[in-house]
């Protein structure tokens, strides 16, 4: 649903129109924004402005992300890498400008091991600070940064 929108980082306003961050911060209270939208060649990803409070195991993370807002979930491995890459194109600054936090924690993805016969207790995590995507026990505790495909 890109519709000729330039790659970049935007804030969705109340009617779901995308506003460039530099325009958004001119508002009386820019911290009213709850999410940013990352537009790339791969699509439009809406990202919560901060991690959910607390730590979660894999199943708890999936549930908490889904309860954040309708349509939200944990990011895929690919989306986590896109978020990391965007840190160097202004994503961290966008979060800060709307009162959020950079996505630099170790968080759950939405993906369990694709071969449950090998290890049904494993799932993928990402390190937002280093860009590392790896494997962890589903019962460990990690952060949750909810995301969603942006819908107008």
Task: For the regions a language model picked out, list residue spans one by one.
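An exposed tryptophan-centered "aromatic clamp" motif
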Residues: 58-73, 77-138, 147-152
